[in-house]
């Protein structure tokens, strides 16, 4: 199973990959079905958003354990420096905006005009492993789809499959996108408290301070 291309450069071909969210008994809760025809058509015309208003790639149907389609994931570009991920789930469209913010990477989740959650990731990779923190407002989204989107996002954007080099990589990352304004710096502090926000920021700092012993 080969990786997707990096959607940070949302032009080009992508390939098959099946992802799954399972329970403790390894039974599938949700899994993806790659929309080959739709993805091929979208990738065939660079900058198709100029004509259609939106270019959607890396489209995957989300199926439940009974093989019923219950949602979709995809990456969408609507203009120069206007990109987002989209979750279709239970009749809702959840827009997911990525921002590189120095030592951390955040994805802000919106239901319409309202921010409902945030994914936070230190820009540190140890032994090809990434770590994510998820904060969602109560009753704003089903936990299984939030967890499954994180798997999809990680594979799409931070895939390390096939890499055998172990160690630690750190970097500072800044993104320049017209949707950067969707990032609300005080979202966690305002909705989960000052102490939780400080815990998250300390987690980011500790990730950079920790050094792998040689």
Predicted regions and their residues:
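Intrinsically disordered, low-complexity proline/glycine-rich segments
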Residues: 1-214
